[in-house]
Amino acid sequence: LTWLGRGVSVSQVKGLLRSGQPAFSEATSQWEEKRQRLQECICNLNERRLDECFNAELALYPPQTLCQQLMLPLLAELELRWRHSPGAQAERVFFFSWLRSKLGARLYHNNRQYSGAPLLLINVSDLPMAPGMWLTAWLASSAGCPVEVFDWPLPPTELALAVEHIQPRAVLLYSSQALNSTHLQRLLGGYDCPCLLVGQVVQIHAEELVAITAQNAELSLAADPLAALHSLTDLNLLHS
């Protein structure tokens, strides 16, 4: 299981168990090559090839491993590339649109098989698309939890109305940027279910959130999709 978590494929694990030799360095190199192939697809705006490469990895590895070894490092590498690369905005829109379509389709089909109250994920930043939120939704859905995703922010009053209608098992608010302090406090209060704040916003508002969490036992914090999955697991929120 440790080898699988590090990104070693099932066929490699069988060989390792026979030989007793670790292959972590080899696995690391393999993941770098996989990310490079995806970057080339994104650079060339080649949707079919990008889809083929991702599907090939999806057939070999579970979502949590792909998120940890492939998608999160890829996003970090792309953000560095996009700071100075010509055509960065076209690449960003292309990749984010593909990612939302790809993961959204998987969520849709998974939701048809699940029952119970959904996990409600809401993008509360000003950015039109939050890839980290979609990765979080994918991880939760792959763990057996129905999910609903709101890709744009809602005013606090309308957010409360949405929660009242949907009756989610938990509310997950995602932001990769700073939020107004007053707005943040309004967003985090008043739910009759657990609330998770996820994304870089947790690190940006770290000091302020210490005081808020001390007063709100229903609030959990997670800096990234993997941490969010762990929090959801610890809170026993993933299964119907």
Where are these regions (language model features)?
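Long amphipathic alpha-helical segments
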Residues: 1-111
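C-terminal regulatory/effector modules of DNA-binding transcriptional regulators
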Residues: 94-240
